[in-house]
Regions:
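Conserved glycine-rich cofactor-binding loop
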Residues: 7, 14-15
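Conserved glycine-rich Rossmann-like NAD(P)H-binding loop of the short-chain dehydrogenase/reductase
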Residues: 28-42
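The beta1-alpha1 cofactor-binding region of Rossmann-like NAD(H)/NADP(H)-dependent oxidoreductases
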Residues: 56-67, 98
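Substrate-binding pocket helix/loop in short-chain dehydrogenase/reductase
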Residues: 92-93, 100-105
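Active-site helix of classical SDR
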Residues: 116, 152
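Residue(s) in the substrate-gating loop at a strand-loop-helix junction
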Residues: 136
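C-terminal helical subdomain
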Residues: 169, 176-177, 184, 192-233
Length: 235
């Protein structure tokens, strides 16, 4: 098994992409910590994969610290962190409430920063680790009516590049996945008439995450773009 006994945290693991990544990591042998706000959802996933469920709100710094502490206490040093939890607001800029802008940025960008900040000491202590951030096609373009989402995902791209600059020489690889439109509850709520056959599957993104988490991925693989019927590796 490619991830045998690796300790992995997956945020937003209760459904969609996060759930698919958690399931695939467990199938590859990892010891997976599933985290999200919904206790029922992550408990169900953790039971399915024999993992650990730790409820956590990505806007609560103390809860994130407790997530990291619980992981190290229960399973040992952290090998892999997948920052997947996300939020979206679909309104034009002039109609977007400031609190909705703040929430999207807090979950999608500040949450990524906080999880990474508190997971890094464990990785630095053992001299190795892998951080996988889930961005989006919106991280390279500016889709209409999703300004906060696009800004946050652009931020994830820049943050990941900085992680490479700061920690690669200390044995910690940092990568970012940019999925195109994916079958998920969040997607169906925003685009209820969209044909799901035109979208990629969460399992495709999970496959990319497993690849990045293993030694098959080199430190020079910064980005993976997952598209319908095509995967492109950007070096």
């Amino acid at each position: 098994m490619e991830l045998n006994n690796k300790v992995a945290i997956v945020t937003g693991a209760g459904r969609g992409i996060g759930k698919a990544i958690a399931v695939s990591f467990a199938a590859a042998g990892a010891k997976v910590v599933c985290t999200a706000r919904s206790k029922d959802e992550i408990n169900a996933v953790a039971q399915q994969i024999d993992g650990l469920a730790v409820p956590c709100d990505m806007v609560d710094e103390q809860q994130i610290r407790e997530l990291i502490d619980a992981t190290v206490s229960e399973l040992g040093p952290i090998d892999i962190l997948v920052n997947n939890a996300g939020a979206v607001a679909r309104l034009p800029v002039h109609e977007l409430p400031t609190e909705e802008w703040d929430n999207v940025l807090n979950v999608n960008l500040r949450g990524v920063f906080l999880c990474t900040k508190y997971a890094l000491p464990s990785m630095l202590e053992q001299g190795s680790g892998c951080i996988i951030n889930i961005s989006s096609g919106a991280g390279v373009v500016g889709p209409a009516n999703r300004s906060a989402y696009a800004a946050s995902k652009h931020g994830v791209m820049g943050f990941t590049k900085t992680l490479v600059a700061e920690y690669l020489m200390q044995g910690i690889r940092s990568h970012v996945i940019l999925p195109d439109a994916t079958v998920s509850q969040m997607r169906s709520e925003g685009f209820p008439t969209e044909d799901p056959d035109s979208l990629i599957q969460a399992e495709d993104i999970a496959d990319a995450a497993v690849f990045l988490a293993t030694q098959r991925a080199t430190a020079h693989t910064l980005e993976l773009r997952v598209s319908q019927g095509l995967r492109t590796r950007t070096l």
